[in-house]
Structure formats: C-alpha cells, structure tokens
Amino acid sequence: NYIFNNNMMSERPEVNKDIFWKQQLSNEVTGRFYAFRKKPINIIKKMEEIKKYCSNNNIKLIFISPPTHVDLQNKINQYNLNKEYILYKEYLKSTGILLDYDVANDITQNSENFNDPYHFSEGIARAIAKDVSVFF
C-alpha cells in the first residue's frame, strides 16, 4: 500500500498516524536510511567549492538542520552514528552558519508538531521561516 520513491516510503500515509509513525521508525525504513552511511567525499569537495565562492563573493552561507522527532533522533545512537552526526554538524558550522533545529527539546518531543518522525508540521515550518528571515 505504500508508494516507494528512491527507496523511501511516501510521507502521505493511507493508514492512521500511529501505525505510519511506527513504520517510519522500523528497520525497513529508517534502517535502510542509516545502514549504508559513508563519508561523502564528493559532497565535501563540492561544499568546499561553494564555501570558497561564498567567501570570495561576500555571501552568507546558511545551513538549516530541520527538526525531526526525538524518536528519529534516537535512531542515530541505535545505528552507532552519533560520532559521524556530531562531525557532520561541526563541518557545517565550520563552513557557514548552522541553524540547528534537530535537537531534543519541547518541540521535537511533541509528536503533534510532526506529520511523521521525519516531517514537521506547517506551524513549525512557519516558525523556522521566521527565524531564517532575520538573515535576509
């Protein structure tokens, strides 16, 4: 009953939210997402080019780490990727400005703020847009 696109399930479920939530956190979905993580050498090279271009042209480089529900954040530890995740965020901070919303807090602990563990609600999107707008 699910539509697969690039090996990921559609975020528009035909089942109730609780069932879909559990499916999104399953090894079938989240496990596949985290299972084959490796250092993205090509992406890092491109990022260095972008960083240099922005620096040479006085452009602010801003990254947004969008919020995910803590149920999904906890999967990083489950798949032993905490060290890599910290390095990833440190790299983004060293490259530009990082607005990091993917941290455990009152917002990310409340499932009402999310359509599923990966996707936040429209209200959260508006709050993030307001935060980001101060940079423009």
What residues fall within each predicted segment?
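Alpha-helix initiation/capping motif
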Residues: 40, 69, 108-110
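Secreted/periplasmic serine-hydrolase-like ester/acetyl group-modifying domain
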Residues: 1-53
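C-terminal regions of proteins
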Residues: 79, 83-136
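Structured catalytic/translocation cores of nucleotide/phosphate-coupled proteins
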Residues: 42-51, 66-67, 127-136
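Active-site segments of SGNH/GDSL-like serine hydrolases
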Residues: 51-78
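Structured helix-beta-strand junction loops
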Residues: 6, 57, 94-95
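Second-shell loop/turn segments in exported
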Residues: 34-40, 75-78, 114-118
